[in-house]
Amino acid sequence: YSEKEIARVVRVAFELAKSRRKRLHSLDKMNVLETGRLWREIANEVARDYPEVELIHMLADNAAMKIITNPSEFDVIVTENSLGDILSDEASVITGSMGMLPSASLASSPPPPGKRRGRRGRPALYEPIHGSAPDIAGHNIANPVASFLSASLMLRWSFGLHEEADEIENAINKIISEGYRTIDIAGDQDHKLSTSQMGDLVAGIISSGPK
């Protein structure tokens, strides 16, 4: 822990919140951990630079309950790594599968809408939140949505290609809303697709252009 590193992470979260619903939840364990008290202190200091963003402090265990009982309360959450690892896996239950969730490890704030980064972009790491699944490797049944959405985050946050990112997200939303699913999220009445079939559908919608 260092004040500089906490401030960097919290500032990225404020920038994200400023471009979204202007609401930021900061999670900690300040009631039992000195590091939690430091986290909250630094978050309050950074908040002075973002008067337009509502900062809400919450203990991590309380947040764990509310993520399940009232997930719409949250938009942008900022917390330290060990708490974030736990809560991000918990949040995946809401979507029905870890195969639905992308992730981005950012070193700085994303470019605002309408601003492109250029060909080289900005270094960051994008990947699904799940790890490897060797037990289903080669069976063509994995959910590729998290991989597609990770690519969308890359276009949006490293390159500022917001329209292109929207095309990927809109294609996925269209397919899922029409009842096409991989087996991990499919119900009895849904059209069950393999990994490659889901990929072909997404690619087909994107190649046909925005509607």
Regions found by a protein language model. Give the residues of each.
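A structured beta-alpha segment of the ubiquitous adenosine-cofactor-binding alpha/beta core
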Residues: 55-74
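Short, conserved micro-motifs enriched in small and acidic residues
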Residues: 3-7, 33, 138-145, 193
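Glycine-rich phosphate/diphosphate-binding loop of Rossmann-like nucleotide-binding domains
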Residues: 1-61
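A domain-level signal for the structural core that forms small-molecule/cofactor-binding pockets
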Residues: 5, 67-68, 97, 207
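Flexible, glycine/charged-enriched surface loops at secondary-structure junctions
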Residues: 19-28, 50-58, 160-169, 177-188
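Phosphate-binding loop/pocket of nucleotide- and phosphate-handling active sites
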Residues: 190-211
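Glycine-rich phosphate/nucleotide-binding loop
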Residues: 68-180
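Generic structural signal for well-ordered alpha-helical scaffold segments
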Residues: 11-14, 68, 203
